[in-house]
Every structure is written in structure tokens, then in C-alpha cells.
A protein has these predicted regions:
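Histidine-rich, glycine-flanked metal-binding segment
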Residues: 29, 33-75
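Alpha-helix-loop-beta-strand connector modules within alpha/beta enzyme cores
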Residues: 138-156, 220-245, 282, 286-290
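His/Asp/Glu-enriched, well-ordered alpha-helical/loop segment
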Residues: 98, 238, 242, 304-307, ...
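Metal-associated gating/positioning segment near the N- to mid-region
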Residues: 72-144, 159-167, 227, 251, ...
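C-terminal cap of metal-dependent C-N hydrolases
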Residues: 27, 38, 369-371, 375, ...
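Histidine/acidic-residue-rich catalytic or RNA/ligand-binding cores of hydrolases
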Residues: 89-93, 133, 214-216, 253-259, ...
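Active-site gating loops and adjacent loop-to-helix segments of metal-dependent hydrolytic enzymes
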Residues: 86-104, 116, 160-178, 212-226, ...
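Divalent metal-dependent hydrolysis catalytic cores, especially in the metallo-beta-lactamase
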Residues: 108-132, 146-156, 201-214, 242, ...
């Protein structure tokens, strides 16, 4: 009897899983930014992957689930290259000292769903407490919580006392909250990269300059030395990881680019020399214009400390200038918002700012959140297009985002990895 049961179990394990097929009837399809849109089409999805994109309305096979989007424009799911899922906007920095890391998972699960509903099917989570981002990544990947595909850095690597290090509390409280993410000198900084990789990071985040929302008042200039940043970039690349650098000040931006950092986040005060370095080194720019909307909306309302407010005021006169200059210079622009500094779910408002302030066309803006972002994630054969073999990351909107980019601010349908987001 035992042998018979074991045989039945073996057959059950060996048997192929039932193939789930879904058929989407689309009124119009943007298969990729820059490609001519298709008219009425039928998209077939099996087990989370796109099998075919066929002109016209094709009858669904027996047993397939049909999804009627015949009045919609269907396009690839969007990518936000800079979010903080476990954070919500506000200035109560002291909560860092009283709330457990586990609470970040609860907040992150809420924000993962909100983000996916907004049409963002892949995000790069750049900075979270210890294992929070990694747990969220696993939760959405295994279908335990609804949300986007998550690329996570874990805690950002920073200098001692800089943006990303714990500050603003009594020394003994700072010590308890320390995430072990600071370094001094190339050797120690390389070790931090190796530790991050060991802990589960699939991207490295550093704070190359001072930051706006931290309690340190040392300005927004360069923090890491050039040799430290080169050690970080070289070590990460040797491990197959890309590096994102939070950077506001011009010299920090230039230094990060020349060190081989892959993406510059914010880039607020980028000057001609910094942009030249980015272009020469192939460093991409993630402008996060919505971050400035978030901090401007809260300025003077008692949300931020005086230290933070002084830095906020320093940045507001520059919004969009660096993006415009970088775009004109031919620097690769990648969509990213810094969601968490403003409310999650408003991510798509970044598109209009990229067009209106940055001089980009709607097609360029859409590419920055699809094909270009996919390439920077080394996932250009997985996401960013509606094509056979790609993950079924699909959204639908009413109207034409190539004519009015604000159309993307209201998404009517979202599918991530073949699963419809409720």
C-alpha cells in the first residue's frame, strides 16, 4: 500500500500543471514605445506569459478566460525605477525609533497594491529597513500579496553621519537603529556591497551626496570620495549588480558618473560638467520630479524640521532644469519618482512633468518607463513590451497616451505576471 501511494504521489508531482489561458480583446495595442500602435488585436496569455499578439478579434479557445478591453488602449506595464514602498510621506522622523521593521512590511504591502493599481508592474525599491524590501519582493513574486515585481536594494550604503545613516536621535538610540550600512574607505565600501549582495539585494543603492529629508545639515554636496564610489561600482559590477546613486550636488553627480555608477537619482544641481560625465560614461538619469512636488506640498506646514525645510527651499528653484539639459545632451532618461516622498499611486503624474518641464515627447516619456527601464534592469527580454515570450505585464487606459500623456494617470486594467490586480 505504501509503495502504491508513493507511486501515485510521484505521478502527481510529475504531471504538468493545468495551463491557464487568458485571451484579451484589445481595441488598440501599443506593443512598445516607438512602435506603430496596432488596431483591434487579440493577446493570448498562458501561464503568465504572452503567447501571441494577433490582428483582429480572434475567438478564444475552449476553457480560456476572455477579457474584453475592446474600448481601451492596451500597453506594457509601467516601470518606476525609484520608490520606497515601506514609506509614506510625512515628517515624523522619530517614528523610525519606535516602529518595528515589521510595520514596514504592512505599509509596504498596502503601497505595493496601490502602486500596481496605478499601472506600475515593476518597481525598483531603493532604500528600506533591513529585510523589509526583500520580504515584499518575495511576497509579490510568490503571489502572497498583490503588487508589482520588485527589485530591492535593502538599506542604502552611506557615509558615517551622512544621508542614509541614522541621525537626529541621542547617540545610544542612533547606535541601536544602525543598519550597518555605512563605510569609510574603498575596502570597507566594497565590503558593504558584498554584504548587501549576500543579504539579498538585487541592486545597490548609495547616497553619493547629502539628502533633503534626512536630519543631517551638512548640505547637498558630495559625500563619498571618488575612490570609494569606484570601489562600490567595480565590486557591484563584478557581482552582476547595478548601482543607483542618490545625488543632488553637481560634483557628487560628476564623481558618481566617472566612477561607473549606473544611474543618478534626482540629479538636482547637475551642471554642464556633470551632464558631460554622464553622457561620456553612459550613466542614466532618473529625475524623480514628483519628489519635489511632494516636498513642496508639505513645505511650511509643520511637517518638516527646520533643518529639512532649509534644504527643501534650496532645491525648489531647480525643478526640471537638470532633466531638460540632460535630455538635450542625449543622456539616457529613465522613469523614476521617489514615491513615498509623495503618496504612492500618484506615480504617473511624473510623465506630464517630464514632458512639460523636461522637454520630452510623450513617446520618449513612455519609453523611459518601459523599454529603457527594462534595459537598465537587464530585463529587456522579460518586460517593457507586449510580445510573445514576455511576461504578461499589461495595462489598459481610455484614450491615447501618445497624444495625451496624462491618460496614464488613470489606469483601468492591470495584469502582473498574468495575474489581474484587483
Amino acid at each position: 500500500m505504501i509503495i502504491r501511494l508513493m507511486g501515485v504521489a510521484a505521478l502527481a508531482i510529475a504531471a504538468p500543471a493545468y495551463a491557464e489561458t487568458q485571451v484579451i480583446h484589445a481595441g488598440r495595442v501599443i506593443t512598445a514605445a516607438g512602435s506603430a500602435p496596432l488596431g483591434e488585436s487579440t493577446i493570448t496569455v498562458t501561464d503568465g506569459r504572452i503567447v501571441s499578439v494577433t490582428p483582429g478579434r480572434v475567438p478564444a479557445p475552449a476553457g480560456a478566460t476572455e477579457i474584453d478591453l475592446s474600448g481601451k488602449t492596451v500597453l506594457p506595464g509601467l516601470v518606476d525605477m525609484h520608490v520606497h514602498l515601506s514609506g509614506d510621506p510625512g515628517g515624523d522622523f522619530w517614528k523610525e525609533a519606535v516602529e518595528p521593521d515589521e510595520w514596514g512590511v504592512v505599509v509596504g504591502a498596502k503601497n505595493a497594491l496601490v502602486t500596481a493599481r496605478a499601472g506600475f508592474t515593476t518597481v525598483r525599491d531603493l532604500g528600506s529597513a533591513r529585510d523589509v524590501g526583500f520580504v515584499l519582493r518575495r511576497g509579490t513574486a510568490e503571489g502572497m500579496i498583490p503588487g508589482p515585481r520588485i527589485i530591492s536594494s535593502g538599506p542604502a550604503i552611506s557615509i558615517i553621519g551622512g544621508h542614509g545613516d541614522v541621525s537626529g536621535f541621542r547617540p545610544e538610540v542612533n547606535a541601536v537603529l544602525d543598519a550597518g550600512n555605512t563605510c569609510t574607505g574603498p575596502e570597507q565600501c566594497a565590503a558593504r556591497v558584498r554584504e548587501a549582495s549576500k543579504n539579498g539585494a538585487n541592486v545597490i543603492k548609495i547616497t553619493a551626496t547629502g539628502g533633503v529629508l534626512s536630519q543631517q545639515g551638512r548640505g547637498l554636496g558630495q559625500h563619498f570620495t571618488d575612490p570609494e564610489m569606484k570601489a562600490i561600482a567595480d565590486t557591484a559590477h563584478g557581482l552582476g549588480l547595478r548601482v543607483a546613486a542618490h545625488a543632488h550636488g553637481a560634483r557628487g553627480i560628476e564623481g558618481a558618473a566617472r566612477a561607473g555608477i549606473d544611474t543618478i537619482e534626482h540629479g538636482t544641481f547637475a551642471d554642464a560638467a556633470a551632464i558631460k560625465a554622464m553622457k561620456e560614461k553612459g550613466t542614466a538619469y532618473v529625475p524623480t520630479l514628483m519628489a519635489f512636488t511632494g516636498i513642496r506640498d508639505r513645505l511650511g506646514k509643520g511637517v518638516y524640521t527646520p533643518t529639512v525645510e532649509a534644504k527643501v527651499r534650496e532645491t525648489l528653484g531647480t525643478i526640471g532644469k537638470a532633466l531638460n539639459a540632460a535630455h538635450e545632451a542625449g543622456v539616457t532618461i529613465v522613469f523614476g519618482t521617489d514615491a513615498g516622498v509623495f503618496e504612492h499611486g500618484r506615480n504617473a503624474e511624473e510623465f506630464a512633468q517630464m514632458v512639460e518641464l523636461g522637454g520630452m515627447t510623450p513617446t520618449e516619456a513612455l519609453a523611459s518607463a518601459t523599454t529603457t527601464a527594462a534595459k537598465l534592469l537587464d530585463m529587456e527580454n522579460e518586460i517593457g513590451r507586449i510580445a510573445p515570450g514576455y511576461s504578461a505585464d499589461i495595462i489598459a487606459v481610455s484614450g491615447d497616451p501618445l497624444a495625451d500623456i496624462r491618460t496614464l494617470e488613470k489606469v483601468d486594467f492591470v495584469m502582473v505576471r498574468g495575474k489581474r490586480i484587483p
